[in-house]
Amino acid sequence: MAERANLVFQNKEIDGTAMKRLISRLIDHFGMGYTSHILDQIKTLGFHQATTTSISLGIEDLLTIPSKGWLVQDAEQQSFLLEKHYYYGAVHAVEKLRQSVEIWYATSEYLKHEMNSNFRITDPSNPVYLMSFSGARGNASQVHQLVGMRGLMADPQGQMIDLPIQSNLREGLSLTEYIISCYGARKGVVDTAVRTADAGYLTRRLVEVVQHIIVRRRDCGTIQAISVSPQNGMTEKLFVQTLIGRVLANDIYIGSRCIATRNQDIGIGLVNRFITTFRAQPFRAQPIYIRTPFTCRSTSWICQLCYGRSSTHGDLVELGEAVGVIAGQSIGEPGTQLTLRTFHTGGVFTGGTADLVRSPSNGKIQFNGDLVHPTRTRHGQPAFLCYIDLHITIQSQDILHSVTIPSKSLILVQNDQYVESEQVIAEIRAGTSALHFKEKVQKHIYSESDGEMHWSTDVYHAPEYQYGNLRRLPKTSHLWILSVSMCRSSIASFSLHKDQDQMNTYSFSVDGRYIFGLSMADDEVRHRLLDTFGKKDREILDYSTPDRIMSNGHWNFVYPSILQNNFDLLAKKRRNRFAIPLQYHQEQEKEPISCFGISIEIPFMGVLRRNTIVAYFDDPRYKKDKKGSGIVKFRYRTLEDEYRTREKDSENEYGSPENEYRTREEECKTLEDEYRTREEEYETLEDEYGIPENEYETLEDEYGILEDEYRTREEESEDEYGSPENKYRPREDKYGTLEEDSEDEHGTLEEDSEEDSEDEYGNPEEDSVLKKGVLIEHRGTKEFSLKYQKEVDRFFFILQELHILPRSSSLKVLDNSIIGVDTQLTKNTRSRLGGLVRVKRKKSHTELKIFSGDIHFPEEADKILGGSLIPLEREKKDSKESKKRENWVYVQWKKILKSKEKYFVLVRPAVAYEMNEGRNLATLFPQDLLQEEGNLQLRLVNFISHENSKLTQRIYHTNSQFVRTCLVLNWEQEEKEEARASLVEIRANGLIRDFLRIGLIKSTISYTRKRYDSRSAGLILHNRLDRTNTNSFYSKAKIQSLSQHQEAIGTLLNRNKEYQSLMVLSASNCSRIGFFKNSKNPNGVKESNPRIPIPKFWGLFRNFSGLLGTIAPSISNFSSSYYLLTYNQILLKKHLLLDNLKQNFKVLQGLKHSLINENQRTSNFDSNIMLDPFQLNWHFLPHDSWEETSAKIHLGQFICENVCLFKSHIKKSGQIFIVNIDSFVIRAAKPYLATTGATVHGHYGEILYKGDRLVTFIYEKARSSDITQGLPKVEQIFEARSIDSLSPNLERRIEDWNERIPRILGGPWGFLIGAELTIAQSRISLVNKIQKVYRSQGVQIHNRHIEIIIRQVTSKVRVSEDGMSNVFSPGELIGLLRAERAGRALDESIYYRAILLGITRVSLNTQSFISEASFQETARVLAKAALRGRIDWLKGLKENVVLGGIIPVGTGFQKFVHRYPQNKNLYFEIQKKKLFASEMRDILFLHTELVSSDSDVTNNFYETSESPFTPFI
């Protein structure tokens, strides 16, 4: 009893780790049998207690952590600050990503630690706590997800998802968090299914390689060893794990005393003596040489001493043990288990955090500033890097604290800075001890807005490749995206322009035609007109209907929604076109508003030639009636013929007087020629404003028209264009139809040869392609250029109908038959007209034409005029009917096929349209428009917009336009070949003006970009009284030169009149008013009259606030940024009520312009060339912040947001490009920080759109520490594949060693030693890499298991061709030991090189063909073995299993052992070889250098400590 009282009673909890230690000590003391008896009793006790306790889980047991709320709030605040820094351009995207990960990872980890203490303190008997922390079921990570927070998740590719899950499973997830969690669940399912199979297959291959490795002998007699030394950075834990269970290869001496002998196995006691000795005498410690499976001299088996102790019972491994199978299972099985582990954690992202050093108390910090170097942390924060251990003192009021910071750490505070308690002062560099995989990852940064790319001189302006757009960054610098207003669709030109924007003609690209106004009668499109003012200006309403409407209170228009979606595809070859929407009110109030507008066309670069059409509009009076199709006939002249005299008067042009029939053949031919089609190709403008998409779908679905089959252009197409049916309402023809008997009476009809054509549709143009479902361009529209305009006085419209039917459709009418209105043509088609039917069969479709009119059979054929237009007197009944002008008929020849002599005449009704030029002038354009001002001439011309005799057709609800009224520009000066035009839109508070500016000279205020495309700045103002006062920044001579070429300035929108107008003002009607410093209220004229708003006009007159490089100090009294634009005095009073305005002008002296570059150097330049301030978003700084700080800024300087240069912070980042006395203008820009080595996409000055790729970062990141990422790496190493992220390619290094070592040593020795060294080095490297994967997962695998596998992978050499051998053929794979023995047995040397084989190839290159055949490629292996006559000695396990024999392990091992007489003199032979070994060490000095210079895995215990491989001892 007394003895029992002396025992220590341990009364504490025990977890899984402590249980492992207890069992290990029990085995050491009592052996396996007694230990199992003790553990059985513990098991019984545990089950009994668990049964009586009956622990169950409830939701109340999941205790949440109280501190979670403020922890998450703190992390969110840090993330917000990080986002702000990124917006300012202080950190780049990779730093932002890293810091975001670490913020949330640190928060999650802190919560996990809090969870442990919370359970332990508040509820130690909590079932969740007991279950998970005792190791019974679950782990800390799963409980943390239940009661803490899930944190950052990884997607299926292993990449981190930026949005952390802040909730835990106890609280419940939001919808977003749930969806992100589903990624992890999916990842777990995929891993369980796929990766488990991978791990199982890996195990099978590993066992296949080493299944024949059996312990067959006690000692192989090797003299090789591997050295282990703790001096080179090996941790004590690794040192112990490496030595325990091994066998010594040499005697160990301390001084002259031997403490361990050769072939002695190392236990825990001996290891402790080694550690004690090394601690006492660290510099005198000798490396310990041990035996490993690498050093065993046997070929296909292993000896007891090279293997060491068995892992199961702690003694030397027994003979007959299948250590190969055990090794394969030991490596493969953790992969299977760890694969399943991810299913439970659900893809939660785990990262690594650096160790932080915190201040112990408040106080001032001090350190030696000479020992640190400024640097930038991984998160973009400024810091100091210390190269050696740094001593830091923190001096509080009464205590002096001293903290030692290890080398290569980051100091996060400045010297002499006051720090608070627990403040982070240093960060110990992560990676010194952590074993993480690194991988190179590309991160693409995309533009957040449209803009123009700009970079500093730090970027290589030459691209990486000759024609590429990729550039490398030599050092860290900023990229700037200068904001622009991109007009990718023309809608943007009306909706996205803000006040004080200035637009250029080049930016107006109307990619299609608009439908202006309102369509009341159409049921499909219902529009609402919103009257919006003020803040809601420029509002776009989106409806689910096909069209949309835009309104801003001043004007409105509707545009097809197809333009919004496909504006990139529209109009590739179209010039820039700018449409001004105008509403046209007819006199009748009852009729709906007719919608049409004046369209202004400005060509590319704004260059106008002579006789250019500047503007045009479509008169609704010349639109085709409602529904119907037909052809247009006219006699026309082109504009080029305008100045030629007319040969005939209008009466002679249009045929003979009424009731007069010419009979002479010459007159017939003359008349026919006048109305014959002119054979030029011009596509008809089917619809002026475009057709909604759904109409084309219907048309194509019904007829199956292919793109290339529609409108193949032929020169002789006449009367051929028709409309597809089912689109038009029937129109009654007053001529009726022919009698039925006339059809039988006449034979087959044939058209005249000149009317006959092979294909009537015309070729589609490039921009009129018809694709199913997508309207790329409005079919039939063509560039409305001067070449194709026909100026006519009268034209005729003749009804005709065309149907395009599929080839397979069955017609219900016959060719050349006469039908009536609404006759059924096919199953789903009915006719709209009555008349003669003509059918033509084409390769891909069938054309069916219906000619309306009467058929007459003349008695005398030669008296009939073919192709004539004849007026009919009987149709003139009264004046009302004559307005319709339906008093003409069109006569055509038709011939009967059966009887060549019989002819008949088809008389078709024609509608005549008269054009009166004088009527348009009063209503559309003011008369002063046609006055010659500034040598420019503008005149009105009516053009017909259809080809003669081409078929026009109505589609759906739109009306076809016959006549277009155009405004044609001309000038008298012959030396001027071109004019310049630009459009300017100005917006005031309640006023909008659009200006058209046309000038004969290049504008002096035109701005030239680097690409030399001239762009106009706006109006040039003139004042009749004193021209020198008008433009203060030009010299008098320059302005006088301008006045010689006066320009016409027209406003395109006039709200004062109820009808539309194109008003032209001379330049002298404009003036400007500037407010100066003596004005008390710069934003208003007088405080007593608050009704007067001062509009902020910057869009047009920015040049008055100082252009680029205006010398500011010279203009002392020019200060304000607000300007007022007046057109004339009447308009001024009417709109702005500025009667009380005191005209307070000061004469400003003219200045020369100068440019200030980025280095603040000034240079004068010609005022004709300036930089381009177009398409910019403006931001104004306070007026009072300029004078004091003029030296701080310069032109072109980039300023980041929130920089305190003045009294107030800069509110927006951008580039300074206009400098005034009291203010400067910043062009808004977004900075992006890019690091060294990043790749920049695009060119300098290139316009980028939102979403375009800007920069690509290449950075290293730690791989997700998930076994699903690590397991493939183990497989790749075993298969000897190249792994970029782990190290340089091992195979390449082996090739280098194979070449260099024989070259240095030379001769046969070189190959022998070179192969030995190469194999030894590669073995150590491979073991290190595999252990790194498993240790990162916390899995402990003994090195000997991996060494047995690697021994087989590296056991082959390839016979070289350098020395021919009679035994082996070049290229043959043989075992290393076999090659060495053959070399010693033969007189000649065998040359060979080391080779690295994967486990699959090794399995197929064994000594047993039965084992190979049972693994893979059975037929091939057996066939080759039969041809070679191979013999299988059945040494392995698989061969015997396949053949049903006894396997040579365990009890079956005795039958395969052949006893050899032991050589008693072996030890003395080893002693005799000592001399040889010392000589070899001198030769192999290179080996140690090779190993130590290997930079594969630094700070790794294998690379640094076990590497001195000594082949002879």
From Swiss-Prot:
Catalysed reaction equations from the record: RNA(n) + a ribonucleoside 5'-triphosphate = RNA(n+1) + diphosphate
GO molecular function: DNA binding; DNA-directed RNA polymerase activity; zinc ion binding
Signal sequence, start to end: none
Cofactor (UniProt): Zn(2+)
Subunit structure: In plastids the minimal PEP RNA polymerase catalytic core is composed of four subunits: alpha, beta, beta', and beta''. When a (nuclear-encoded) sigma factor is associated with the core the holoenzyme is formed, which can initiate transcription.
Keyword entries, A-Z: Chloroplast, DNA-directed RNA polymerase, Metal-binding, Nucleotidyltransferase, Plastid, Transcription, Transferase, Zinc
GO cellular-component term (any): chloroplast
GO biological process: DNA-templated transcription
Function: DNA-dependent RNA polymerase catalyzes the transcription of DNA into RNA using the four ribonucleoside triphosphates as substrates.
Cofactor annotation comment: Binds 1 Zn(2+) ion per subunit.
Name of the featured protein: DNA-directed RNA polymerase subunit beta''
HAMAP family listed in its UniProt record: RNApol_bact_RpoC2
Basic and acidic residues bias (residue ranges): 659-679, 726-737
Bias (Acidic residues): 680-707, 738-767
